[in-house]
Amino acid sequence: MSSRGVRAAGTDGNDFQNRQRIAQHYQESAQYKSVLKWFFVPHFLILVFMWLKVGSEFLRYNFGWKNAFFERLDMPAAYPWEYVWCLSFIPIVLALSSFQRNKLKVLHYAYYAEFICGIFPCMIGLGGQLPELLEYANDMEGSNTPTFKGIFPMVIIWYIFFAVALQIHGFSMYFMHHLAAAWAPVKRD
């Protein structure tokens, strides 16, 4: 749509650039949402394996359910922190539900749930498994550490899990914090 008459005085027609830029906080919001979704993928994959481990044990001991596959794996009993970590799907659900309308309060709930259901159980597991790790490191042949399929020590598997899970939870909290900062209203002095 063109205007009638001559061009406005003092412009050469190149003053549209300021209207074509997207505000920085919108760019950051889209970027952090995308990154968080990518962190939720490995978190959910690990969560599925943990649900299988803990769920099979729960069904076996409480309902007498038997499955040849899980019996062949010869997994040790689940620790209490594993049951709490299985609730770490809650921050994923909260964060994803906050994305559509940029609900800051729901994102804050997801942030704190990430700590309570994700990092806190992992830290308890780290501390609880430390004596077992030290025992295994000092005497690999004579230690009584539970094994996976009778071969590989579970304490090593747990510490690999802790390394991966703590990074996923830590980076998720980091990006949730920055996403909340992008969504927060600007404070005027």
UniProtKB/Swiss-Prot annotation:
It is a multi-pass membrane protein. The chain crosses the membrane at residues 35-55, 76-96, 106-126, 151-171. It is found in: Endoplasmic reticulum membrane. GO terms for cellular component: endoplasmic reticulum membrane. InterPro entries: Jagunal. Residues 56-75, 127-150 are lumenal. Residues 1-34, 97-105, 172-189 are cytoplasmic. Keywords: Endoplasmic reticulum, Membrane, Transmembrane, Transmembrane helix. It comes from the Eukaryota. The keyword Transmembrane helix applies. GO terms for biological process: endoplasmic reticulum organization; vesicle-mediated transport. PANTHER family: PROTEIN JAGUNAL HOMOLOG 1. Belongs to the jagunal family. This is Protein jagunal homolog. It comes from Caenorhabditis briggsae.
